[in-house]
C-alpha cells in the first residue's frame, strides 16, 4: 500500500486530500493489523469521512491516531468516541478542530479509551465544562499527558482539573493561552491529585503575583521537572522569589520572562 512504511507500522496520509472514497478503500483493505500509527491530519475530514473511519475494522494494532487540523466537531467526536478504531489507542491527536463541550463530554465518556495515555485537544473550544467532563471521567485511567492549550478552559476548567480525583497518574499538563488567572494557578498549586506531574506548561495566561507566589510555595509540585510560565502578569519581585525557591532548585527547566 502506498504511504505505508516498509515495516508496515506507519501509514502516512497527512495532507493527501483523503476523502470518503479513499477512506472507504481502507475499510476493504485485507490486513492493516501491523499499522501502529495512522496520520490523517490536514485532510478537511468531516462527518461522512468520520462515519467511514469509525467502521474500519482492520486497524487492530493501532496505538496512535493523528486527526489534527481537520473539520471535526461535536457530532464527529461523538461518532469517534464509539469507534472500534479507538480501542487500543495510546495517543489521540485532535488538535485544531472544532470540538466543543459536547464533543469533549463524548470523549470523556467513551468506553474505548481506557488505554489512552496522551490526549491532544489543543485549539478546540471545549471550554470549562469540557475540561470538567475530562476531569470527572473514570474512563481515562491510563492518561499521562493532557494537552489543552487554547481551549478556553479558564479558571473554572483549571480548577476542575486540579480537583480531579482521577488524574493521579497525570505527568504532563499543558494549559497555555487559556486566560487562567490567580484562581486557576492557586488551584493547581494546592492540588492533591497532580502530585505526579513532571511537566506543567501555563505560559501566556493572566497569572499575577498571588498565583506566582502560590506556585513557588507549592507542595504539590515535588516531582515537577519542567515548568513553562512565561507571558503572564507576574511582577519582577515575585519572579525573583520563584527563581530562588526550592521548586526552582528541583527543576531541570524553568522558562519565565
Language-model features and meaning:
Residues 6, 30-33, 57-60, 84-87, ...:
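Inter-repeat linker/turn residues at the boundaries of leucine-rich repeats
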Residues 45, 51-126:
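A generic tandem-repeat structural signature
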Residues 1-51, 63, 68-71:
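LRR N-terminal entry segment and analogous cap-like coil->beta motifs
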Residues 1, 19-28, 47-55, 74-82, ...:
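Leucine-rich repeat
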Amino acid at each position: 500500500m502506498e504511504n505505508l512504511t516498509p515495516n508496515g507500522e506507519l501509514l502516512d496520509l497527512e495532507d493527501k486530500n483523503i476523502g470518503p472514497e479513499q477512506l472507504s478503500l481502507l475499510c476493504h483493505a485485507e490486513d492493516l493489523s501491523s499499522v501502529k500509527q495512522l496520520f490523517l491530519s490536514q485532510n478537511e475530514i468531516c462527518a461522512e469521512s468520520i462515519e467511514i473511519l469509525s467502521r474500519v475494522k482492520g486497524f487492530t494494532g493501532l496505538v496512535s491516531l493523528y486527526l489534527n487540523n481537520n473539520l471535526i466537531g461535536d457530532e464527529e467526536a461523538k461518532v469517534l468516541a464509539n469507534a472500534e478504531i479507538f480501542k487500543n489507542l495510546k495517543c489521540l491527536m485532535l488538535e485544531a478542530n472544532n470540538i466543543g463541550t459536547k464533543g469533549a463530554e463524548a470523549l470523556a465518556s467513551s468506553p474505548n479509551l481506557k488505554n489512552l495515555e496522551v490526549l491532544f485537544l489543543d485549539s478546540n473550544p471545549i471550554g470549562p465544562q469540557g475540561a470538567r467532563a475530562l476531569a470527572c471521567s473514570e474512563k481515562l485511567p491510563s492518561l499521562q499527558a493532557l494537552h489543552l492549550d487554547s481551549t478556553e478552559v479558564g479558571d473554572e476548567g483549571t480548577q476542575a482539573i486540579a480537583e480531579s480525583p482521577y488524574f493521579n497518574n497525570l505527568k504532563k499538563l499543558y494549559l497555555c493561552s487559556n486566560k487562567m488567572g490567580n484562581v486557576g494557578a492557586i488551584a493547581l498549586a494546592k492540588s492533591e491529585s497532580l502530585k505526579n506531574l513532571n511537566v506543567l506548561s501555563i505560559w501566556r495566561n493572566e497569572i499575577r503575583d498571588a498565583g506566582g507566589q502560590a506556585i513557588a510555595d507549592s507542595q504539590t509540585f515535588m516531582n515537577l521537572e519542567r515548568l513553562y510560565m512565561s507571558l503572564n502578569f507576574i511582577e519582577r519581585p515575585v519572579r525573583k522569589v520563584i527563581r530562588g525557591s526550592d521548586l526552582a532548585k528541583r527543576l531541570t527547566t524553568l522558562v519565565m520572562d
